[in-house]
Design a protein with these regions (language model features):
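N-terminal signal-anchor/first transmembrane alpha helix
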Residues: 2-14, 19-27, 31-34, 38-46, ...
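Primarily recognizes Gram-negative and organellar outer-membrane beta-barrels
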Residues: 60-64
């Protein structure tokens, strides 16, 4: 029998709980449970009557009352109304879930009563929740926490991308729902041009830096794994020391080394050469700065890849190489057919994480160039080494272009999430898991 048919043919006590939560439980003698449902209903009614209904309406209007200090009018705050509206939606979802649990509970109680069994007391219900349905009870608080502190901010950011909030439209000016942020970043204007250039550079940076880190770490692991290398343990300690030093200290150290008055330029001038503008805000420094960024990122990231691949290489059966040598395979062929597939299979999830981390690597160029903004090349509040995450920071934190920043963060999520999912689903680590077991 369907749920709808059960409700139609249910006893009158069940139908009471359909109208007012908890009444059915009271009629079945479950006093404490019924009172808890009734108190929950009363609290929800008070909340929605006091401000919940207004908050739900505010998520659609984003405010209707403009602030006027001269007339003493305290206007609406659009972003506050948006986030409170989202909170009201979460409360509404909770209310619906509570109502469904109330109906299920009273239906279960009615079936037990029809069988001549006594309805569970509140203590028995608690014992059942702690025993048979412990997984539900244990997940309640984590789910509420994730919803409040993870889901709510993410949804808030996504919705902000579809408003005109930012720039001149900040409190006390009322925001409205708009696609203006997307029109700007996808258009042909200054913002759109900057977005296109930074996006291309961001993808190039993520792919190349991930490849450098992987092959650099694998190369060092292979080199130090050779039997004829003396003191390999000592040599292996040097990359580990670079990995152990906090990243921002390494970045600031390299910034000093490549600065206008740093040691490298001092050596150049002492040897009769002109100083090079490695990190300066000039067009000639564009690829110098980008190349230094690749080098610094490799310095920080290669040691971790080296450590992982060292352990992976030690698990490869040496008989595979012996058989390949007997068949006449060259060293490069052995690397391409045996070593590389085995390592890539084992490290694919890590490489995906490295790609996403490099795509969102805020610190490299922020610490190297101090967040400067190019005065050439037609960049809007950005430099020629900025990644999307750096540009997002400049737009939202320094210049209050919040909706554009939210739209860019949504683009970052779509790109990294889609590429990561596609690469992983097509990788041997997912499709041929049993091959290397």
């Amino acid at each position: 029998m369907s749920k709808a048919a059960q409700l139609v043919n249910a006893p009158w006590r069940v139908k009471l709980s359909l109208v007012i939560m908890g009444l059915g439980q009271l009629c079945y003698g479950q006093i404490i449970k019924g009172l808890l449902y009734i108190l929950s209903l009363a609290g929800l009614v008070v909340y929605f009557a006091a401000r919940g209904a207004e908050d739900l309406a505010g998520i659609f209007t984003l405010g209707t009352k403009q602030e006027n200090l001269w007339l003493g009018i305290e206007g609406d705050n659009s972003m506050q109304m948006l986030i409170m509206g989202l909170f009201a939606v979460m409360v509404l979802v909770f209310a619906l879930a509570l109502y469904v649990s109330n109906v299920r509970d009273v239906l279960y109680t009615s079936r037990e009563a029809a069988k001549g069994r006594r309805p569970h007391s509140f203590r028995q219900s608690l014992a059942a929740a702690a025993d048979g349905k412990f997984y539900v009870s244990a997940l309640v608080l984590p789910i509420v926490g994730v919803a409040m502190f993870s889901v709510l901010p993410i949804v808030f950011m996504i919705l902000m991308a579809f408003t005109d909030f930012g720039g001149e439209v900040v409190h006390p000016v009322l925001a409205s729902w708009s696609l203006s942020a997307w029109q700007k970043i996808l258009g042909v204007g200054e913002v759109g041009g900057t977005f296109g250039k930074i996006l291309v550079w961001n993808v190039l940076w993520a792919v190349v830096s991930t490849a450098i880190n992987f092959f650099g770490g694998l190369g060092i692991a292979l080199l130090l794994g050779k039997r004829n290398v003396r003191g390999s343990k000592i040599w292996r300690a040097f990359p580990i020391l670079a990995y152990a030093i906090p990243g921002f200290i390494s970045m600031l150290g390299f910034k000093f080394m490549f600065s206008q008055s740093g040691p490298i330029n001092q050596l150049l001038t002492a040897s009769g050469h002109d100083a090079i503008f490695f990190l300066a805000n000039v067009e000639s420094a564009k690829w110098w700065a980008r190349g230094i960024g690749f080098f610094v990122n490799a310095w920080i990231s290669i040691p971790s890849i080296m450590l992982m691949t060292t352990g992976i290489l030690s698990n490869i059966d040496t008989q595979l190489y012996e058989a390949a040598s007997i068949d006449g395979a060259s060293r490069f062929t052995q690397f391409r057919k045996i070593t590389l597939p085995f390592v890539v299979f084992s490290i694919t999830p890590v490489l995906i994480g490295q790609f996403v981390g490099n795509f969102n690597n805020f610190g490299i160029y922020f610490f190297l160039r101090g967040g400067l903004q190019s005065n050439y090349g037609g960049y809007f509040l950005a430099s020629d080494t900025d990644l999307l995450i750096n540009w997002l920071y400049n737009l939202s934190v320094d210049n209050n272009y919040y909706s554009i920043g939210a739209a860019i963060s949504l683009v970052i999520f779509v790109i990294t999430g889609t590429l990561s999912l596609i690469v992983y689903m097509r990788s041997a680590a997912y499709r041929k898991e049993e091959t290397f077991q």
